[in-house]
Amino acid sequence: MMALGEPYYSSKPDKDFNFGSTMARRQMTPTMVTKLPKFVRNSPQAYDWIVRGLIFPTTGKTYFQRVVVITGGLEDGTYGSYAFNGSEWVEIYPIEHLNLMSSLKLIHKANALQERLRLSQEEKATLALDVQFLQHENVRLKELIPKPEPRKIQMKWIIVGAVLTFLSLIPGGYAQSQTNNTIFTDMIAACKYSTETLTENLDLRIKLALANITINDKLDAVRQILNFAFVPRAHWLRTVFYYIHYYEMWNIFMFVLAIGTVMRSARPGTDLITLATSHLSGFRMAVLPTIPFHTTMTLWVMNTLMVCYYFDNLLAITMAILAPILGIIFLCFMEDSNYVSQIRGLIATAVLIAGGHACLTLTGTTTSLFVVILTCRFIRMATVFIGTRFEIRDANGKVVATVPTRIKNVAFDFFQKLKQSGVRVGVNDFVVIKPGALCIIDTPEGKGTGFFSGNDIVTAAHVVGNNTFVSVCYEGLVYEAKVRYMPEKDIAFITCPGDLHPTARLKLSKNPDYSCVTVMAYVNEDLVVSTATAMVHGNTLSYAVRTQDGMSGAPVCDKYGRVLAVHQTNTGYTGGAVIIDPADFHPVKAPSQVELLKEEIERLKAQLNSAAENPVTVVTQQPIVTLEQKSVSDSDVVDLVRTAMEREMKVLRDEINGILAPFLQKKKGKTKHGRGRVRRNLRKGVKLLTEEEYRELLEKGLDRETFLDLIDRIIGERSGYPDYDDEDYYDEDDDGWGMVGDDVEFDYTEVINFDQAKPTPAPRTTKPKPCPEPKIEAQPLDLSQKKEKQPEHEQQVAKPTKPQKIEPQPYSQTYGKAPIWESYDFDWDEDDAKFILPAPHRLTKADEIVLGSKIVKLRTIIETAIKTQNYSALPEAVFELDKAAYEAGLEGFLQRVKSKNKAPKNYKGPQKTKGPKTTTH
C-alpha cells in the first residue's frame, strides 16, 4: 500500500476553503501537480475521490479503483472538472459544487474589480500626463498671443470731432442782441414784472373762488411749469437756464455724441460724418431714430443725400424717393435677408428726407418728425413683446441683457410679499426618519432607493426591471440579493442577504394618515428628506416634492416613520407613490387545476343532490341541434370535462389508491418527493370515457393529449409528485452530476455504457437464477447487481408462473422486447417528431446519465428535421436511441409513446423486470 503524504493545496485560498475530500488531496503526486490544468491563480479547487467505473468505461477489478477528480475555475473563465487517468488529466462533465461556484464567482468579481482598478489607475496617470502637456501648451500659446495695444485715435477724427464741437457751440436762433441796461431800466422791468404777476395772481384767485377755471387756464399752468416759472428769479437755476437758452437741445446732444464717439466708438469716422451731415442738413434729432434701420450701404446713401440737401433740396428729395425703387430693381440679386435689410434702409432714408423737408418747411424744426419716428418704434417694440421677458444677444449669440416685458410693481411689492407670506399661526410637527433603514439598489440599467421591512428589501419594480439578482449597497458594502416577488403594483420585494444586518427596519402603518408624508431617498449617494401634503388617488399618492433621479423606490412615511407607500414617479416637481398593503408582501397562491376541478366536482355533486331531491316533472322537448348548427364556447367544453371527471373520479380514486399503495410509503432519506421514480401501468384497466364521449370532446376542440396530461397530473399528485414543477430545479446544467456530493450514497456496482466496445468479462461461476416473487415491486434502475442467493425454503415456495427469458448479455439487463426496425420504418411527421422525446425536466436520472449524449443528438436531429421538413433521418436516430436504451435496461422511447397514447385495449404495458437498486438523493 502506497504511503500517503500531506494534503496538497495549490494556494492559501485553497487551503482556507478546503473543498472536497482530504483523501483525494493526499493522493496528489508531483507528476499530477506538474500536469495540473491552468486554474485561476489563488483560487480554491474541490477534490473528489470517485470510483473509476463511474467516470471511465472499466471492467474487472479496476472498476472499483478510485481516481482523483479536481473541479475549479479555469483562466479562460470556464468551470470544469478533470480526472487523472494515470498519465494525464482528462476533462469530464463538470461536477457542481455550490460553495465552490459561489467562491469562484466572488473571486472572479474581485479579479474583475482589480483589473478595472488597474485600468482606471493607468487611465488616470495618462490623463494626468495629458493635463500637464496641455498646461505647458497653454502657457506656450499664451506667449504667442499678441498683447492688446492701447487704442490709438487718429488725428483726423480728433479734428472732425473738434469741428463738430465748434459747430455745436455756435449760438442758435434763440441768441439775443446785448442791450445797455441801467439801474433805472432794471427797476422799471422789476416793477412791470411784479405788477403783471400780481394781476395774474388776483385773476387766478378770483377764478378759483368762482370755480371758473377754463381749459386755457390749465394749459397756461402747464406752460408755466415747463418754463420753470415756479423758480425764484434770484435762484442759481435761472442763471444756468439763461446761458443754456442761447443753445438748442441738438447742439448740446451733438456735443456729447461727438465726445463719446471720438473716445469709445469702433467706427469714429462713420459716426462723426453722420453727425456732421445731420447738423448741416438741418434734420438733426430726426436722424438718430432711423439709424437702426440702416445697413452700411444705406447709411452712406443717407449721408450723401443729406449733403446734397444742403446744396439742392429738391434734387435730394427726388433722389431719396427714387432710391427704394431703384434698390428693389438693382439689388434683387442679393440674399433674402440682406435684400430686405437694404430695402428697409432705403425706405427709411426716403421717409427721413421727404418728412424732414416737410417739417422744416411747415414748422422750421424736425422735432415733430423725431416724435413720430420714435412713436413708431415704440409701437413696433410693444407688438413683439409676447413673453414675460426678452433676451438681447450680441453678434456671437451671447445673451448680454434680459429685459422684462412687464414693469415690476415697485410701489406695492412690499404689500404683495407681506400678503403672500402671511402671519405664522401654527408650529410644524417633528417627523421620525430612519436613515439606517435605507439602501441603494444598483442594476445595470440604473440606481434606485430601497428600504428594509421585515426580511425583505422593498423598492420600485421599474428599478429592478427584468433582473433576477441586484446589487444592494449599504453602508459602503455591496451585497448580491435575489428578487423574491413582484406583485401587479410597481413594487418589488428582494430577499435580504443573510450577511446583511441593517441597523433599522421600517414597519407598515396600521392607521394610514396621508395629511403629511415624508420622503427619504438617496440622491447621488446623499440622503435627502422632504415633507409634503399628499392626496390619495385610488392606490396612488401625489405630493409636491422636487423629485430627482435615484429616488424611485424610496419609502413614503407618515410623521411616526411608518411606511405608507413606495415612491415611483419622477416628473421633476410632482412626486407620486403607490400605496403598499400587508397583502402585497406575500404572493397569492393560485389554486391548482386539480383543486379547481375538485371544487367544481363538489359543487356539481351538490347540484345533483338538490336536483334529485326536487325532480322536475315538466320536460320541454328541445330540437336536436347538430354540431354544425351550434356555437360551442370554451365554458361549455370545460363544463363537459368537469361532468366527465365527476363520473370517473370515484373509480380513479379506488384503483389509484390500490396501485400506488407501495409508492405512498415514505422511505428514509427520500427528500426529492419521488422525483425520477419509475411508474408503470398506473392507468391499467381504467376506462375513463366512452367512445362517443371521447369523440364529442375532440369535436368540441379539447385536445386528447391535454385531457390525458390532466389525468396524469392527478395520478402523479396522488403518487407523490409535488403540486407544481420546480422549474428552478430542472436547469440546463443539471445533467445528472448534481448527485455527486458529500451527502450522496453511491452504488459502485453500476456500469455506465458510453457506446464503446463491450469488453469480454472474466469467466464466472454459474449461479442459480432467482425465481420471480408473487408480488413484484418497481425498483430503481441499476445496470448491474450482485444477486444474493435465496434460502432453500424460499426457492421451494416460489414457483415461476411465466416462461424464463433468454439470458441477457454480460453486465447488462434488458427491458421488454428488443426494438425491431420495421416498427420504426414508417412516414414520420412533425407531431411524431415533437412527441417522441419528453420534456427535459421529465427525463429520469437514469435517462440523463446513460442516454444523455444520444438524447441531445436526437433533439438536434429533430430540430433540423422540423426546420427543413425532412424526416428521413429521424427513424434511424430513434431506432439507435431505443436500441441503446434496450441494452442499458431502459424502456424505449417509442414504446413509451405507444404505451401512453396508442395502447390497444388488451395492452398490459411493458414487461416487468427486476433490476438492481440505485440510490438517488
From Swiss-Prot:
Gene3D superfamilies named in the record: Trypsin-like serine proteases
List of residues that carry O-(5'-phospho-RNA)-tyrosine: Y694
Positions annotated as active site in the UniProt record: H462 (charge relay system), D490 (charge relay system), S552 (charge relay system)
Compositional bias per record (Low complexity), positions renumbered to this chain: 908-921
Domain of life: Viruses
Annotated region (Disordered), positions in chain: 753-813, 900-921
GO cellular component: host cell membrane; membrane
Record's comment on post-translational modification: Cleaved by the viral and host proteases. The protease is probably autocatalytically cleaved.
Reaction equations catalysed: RNA(n) + a ribonucleoside 5'-triphosphate = RNA(n+1) + diphosphate
InterPro entries in the record: Astro_1A, Astro_p19, Astro_VPg, Mamastrovirus_p20, Peptidase_S1_PA, Peptidase_S1_PA_chymotrypsin
A GO BP annotation: viral translational frameshifting
Residues under site feature: Cleavage: Q176, S177, Q420, S421, Q665, K666, Q756, A757
Keywords: Covalent protein-RNA linkage, Host membrane, Hydrolase, Membrane, Phosphoprotein, Protease, Serine protease, Transmembrane, Transmembrane helix, Viral RNA replication
Segments crossing the lipid bilayer: 240-260, 287-307, 314-334, 345-365
EC number: 3.4.21.-
EC supergroup of this enzyme: hydrolase
Pfam families in alphabetical order: Astro_1A, Astro_p19, Astro_VPg, Astrovir_pp_1, Trypsin_2
Extent of Basic and acidic residues compositional bias: 784-796
SS bond partners: none
GO molecular function: 5'-3' RNA polymerase activity; serine-type endopeptidase activity; serine-type exopeptidase activity
Similarity comment: Belongs to the astroviridae polyprotein 1A family.
UniProt protein name: Non-structural polyprotein 1A
Organism for this UniProt entry: Human astrovirus-8 (HAstV-8)
Organism lineage string: Viruses, Riboviria, Orthornavirae, Pisuviricota, Stelpaviricetes
